[in-house]
Amino acid sequence: MEHARKTTYARRARRFPHGLVTMNHMEALHENLWPAPYAGKPLNATVVVPGSKSLSNRYLILAALGHRPVRLVGLLRSRDTELMMDALRALGVRCEIDEQVDTTVTVVPPSDGRFHGGTKVFCGLAGTVMRFVPGLAMFADGPVAFDGDEQAYARPMKPVLDGLEQLGACICLLYTSPSPR
């Protein structure tokens, strides 16, 4: 298969006088496309989650965006995932830790379908919490305040905050960090 790709690229590539061979980036991208899987009906499956704090936090967010409870098995338990579960709880999501297997967590989105505002989220130093949860907070029924460890204020948040403002978020910075964004 690899040989066939090289052959295909060679046929589509252009040669320049100095010997450099190149091809159109879009042509190269098209060569590597594959059809995305499609489910013709709602899925009912059990997925074993790998032990990654970054992936575990993303799975928690995806589960919180659903309309029914989601059981996550093999969730990594770390400070970052605890901070994510606490952040989701602050928004009205139930994160129920299995009493027998603490790496199994059932995530129950708010029954009214809305995230709850009027709360404060502590991000610690968890990048996934400080970058993903503010987007969820845009859908809350009231304002949500965010805070973190002192070192978190040095994190580059300007692109995230600018993007949220472009989507209509009202952001008020309430701290005196020398470099707030």
State where each predicted segment sits.
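Active-site-proximal loop->helix
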Residues: 159-163
